[in-house]
Each structure stands twice: as C-alpha cells, then as structure tokens.
Amino acid sequence: MSRVTREELIKVIQEQSEMIAVLHGIIENLSKTVEESNQIIINLNKTIDELTQRVKELTEQLGMNSKNSSKPPSTDINKPAPKSLKKPSGKKPGGQPGHTGNHFNISLEPDETIFHMPSGCLSCPNHDICLSRACVGEIRNVVDAVVNVKLTAHQSLVVDCPLTGITHKGMFPDDIKAKMQYGDNFQAFVVALNTVGAVSVNRTHEIISGIFGVPLSTGTIVNMVNRCADRLTGIMEIIRQKVIESEVGHFDETGTNVGGKNHWVHGASNPLFTHLSISDKRGFAGMEAGKVLPYFTNVAVHDCWPAYWKYLLIIHALCNAHILRELVATEERHPEQKWATEFMKLLLDMKEAKELAIASGKNELDEEQLLEFELRYDALIKRAYEENPLPLESETKKRGRKKKGKTLALIERLDKHKASVCLFIYNFEVPFSNNLSERDIRMIKTKTKVSGCFRSILGAENYLKIMSYVGSSKKHGKSAYEAIKQAVSGNPEFFFT
C-alpha cells in the first residue's frame, strides 16, 4: 500500500473544506427557507382566521331579516317563514262574541233612486198600475264619488254715491289676492296627496290634472307645500315644548337621502304629539339639532344607540322589541345556546305579568314577582357569559378594542343596562317597546322609497313640519286632510281647542 504524501493530504483536506463550506451554505439556505416557510404558514393561518371571521360575519348578514333585526321587510331576500313571539290566544279568527261590530254603512240620504220592476212586468199593459202599488222589497246602495270643481267669482262693485257724488269700489277679502287662485280645499288636497300620501310632485300633477281638469304646474305644488309648512312654524314650537314636558318620551332615528347625501330624521314623540327634525348627523350632534333631548329630563325610551347615553339627566328605558329581534338572531346563529330562547321567554313573561296587573287594576307588580324576574335575569346573564366567554388576549397586540361579536355585545348590553331593560315593570307608564316612535317615523321610510330622495334640505324640513303637525293632529282624533285644510286656512292650532 502506497503512502499518502503530504501534498495529497493537503489537497484532500482542501477538497473536504470546500465541501463543508458548500454544505454550510446549503444548510444556511435551508434554514432561511424554513424560517420563511414558517412565517408564510403564520401569515396564512392569520389570513385563514380573518377569512373565517369574515365568512361568519357575511353569513350573519345574509341571515338578517325583518324578523331578527331592524331591517325593513322590503329588504328581505328569502322571506323567512312566519314566526311570531305572541302566544296563541285560543280564540277563533274574526269578531268575538259580544263585540259591537262594524260594516260598510253610510247614513246619507240618496241623491238618486232607481226602481227595478220584475223583468216580466216591463212589457205588461198594467205596468204603471203595478208600479204605483209596488212596495220596496230590498234596498241596495252604491256609493260613488263625483268630482265637481266649484268656481267662485268675486266681483268688486263700483258705486257712485248719490249724496256725495264720489265713486266707491268694493274691497276684496284679504285672502283673495289674485285674478285666479286655488281655494283652501283644493290646496289641502294637493298638499295631503304629496306629503301624507307620499306621492311625488310629478305624479301629484298628473293625478290632480286628470281628476279635476284644472291646470296645475309642479312648481305650484311645491309652493303650496312650502306655504303650508311656513304656517306651521309656531305650532312646531308648541309641539316641541309638549314633547319636552312629557313624563315619558319616545325617541328614534331613521335614514333618508337629501340631494344625494345621507341624512337622518330624528323623531321625538309622546302619545299626543310628534316632533320630527333632520340633520346630516345620526348621533349626538343630530340629537342636539332637534332641540328636544337637550332639554328633556324624564323617561326616554330608545333603541340603545350610544349617543343617547350622553344625556345624563334623563332616565333611560330600552325598547324590548329591538332586544327580542336580536335574541331571535342569536337563537338562529347559535341554536345550541338555549339562553337566548329563555331570555325571550323572560321578557314576554314580564310583559304578560304587567298586562295582567293592569287588567286587575294594579299599578305595580308584587315584590315576589319582581324578585323572581330579577333572579331569572341574573341567572340567564351568567349562563350567557359562560357560553360566550370574553376573547383571549392575542400574542400580537392590536390597537383598539377587541372584537367581541354580536352575541357577546348583546350580552354585555343586557348586563350593563339591566335597569333600563326592566324599567317597564317598575314604572307602568313606561311601555314595553318603542313602537310609538317607530310608527311616527315609518312614513319617512315610505316617502324615501317612493320618491328616492329630497332635492333640498328645505324641502325635507318642510315635509317634516307637515308630518309632525299631521301626526300630532291624528293623535288628537283629527284626520290628515282636516288638519292640512285648517293649516292652509291659517288655523293650525285648531286641535288644541
């Protein structure tokens, strides 16, 4: 065996060193690749979590409808099967025994009477004799509308006085200002059609021109509405004060469009008065602009919009109809969680207990009942927290509040505002829901849906003046047309007398 020379050994060592260096480079590259792969996996997991959360949110949005949220029924895509929280009454449909009943009946003398003889008598020679002896066997009435346009000519008479020789001219009444003008009935009908009827200006023009045959431009319609609103400035201040003085006030807001931009109609009302205002802000600034809440100090029923809680002097009561809808949504999202179903039952039991107490002539619930409801409330909140724990702190800190989800947000709201949720069983003047205010602003949704938007803020303000006035009049038992006619005639305070 030949002996390895020193030169050969050095060469082998150099080759091995070079190979080791190459392997070190490969290892470093592989380590770098592994680190990059690990980071990619971390980023992918993060993306998957975010997408999973987004899918969950979108699924929840698709599941929202008019039955489990505040969305209007018109937005329902796949309309859900009817589901009511009301308990069966056990009564048969229709009128109940003992009720007075209503049917189509008008106590007016007929303008025209048509007699109908038997068909066989028409060609009989004794027809006239039989007709004179006939008696009425049955009466059927047809109620129809006949449109008549009444033109009243006002003529100013000129008289030469025989005593003084001076010529005198008769004066027109103050409200007769032009050679041709529209009367109060006509103006009231036009304004009512455009505002209360939610008919657009163009369609109002078509309807009026077609029915009455009277020329009427769209500009004249707008002027009629504006003049009517101008006469309501004083009554709006009275309505505002009446709402401020309420023992229980109802407050709500809804969106609309003015000149292509989002605005918010703020409603403030009580059982006798309705006050509507508009602002480009939904929150605190919009409420301040309405000039009702800043001066209100009694019980305010609302939907828990955060801006309401900035008013520290009022007593807050929450709309339980909103809460029931949110509980329905929770039940649909998490059918395995039974606390939402039991919480709905608790609220409805509280409502029923109050109704039974009122029917019995009581003005408060028994202490035992109140204690039972309190204990059930607290137990359900505790159970809800156990099934929906707070989110854990993440390793990577993020700015802002941790996202909790709708279910946990609802639980925390029910926990934090327990007194406001239950106020209706402690104060019988406080209603279970805020339906009164929701009814008062419902026409705004209809108007927006029909007309699309208001062209100007002035047009929106004038519309809300008229709707506030009409809403208040209807609560006093007056019809919308009667109210608008009185306003056009210059007597908007008529329903106070």
Task: Please state what every model-predicted region is.
Residues M1-M180, V222, F251:
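Short, flexible loop/hinge motifs at secondary-structure junctions
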Residues S2, E28, V158-D160, I166-T497:
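Catalytic center-proximal scaffold of phosphoryl-transfer enzymes
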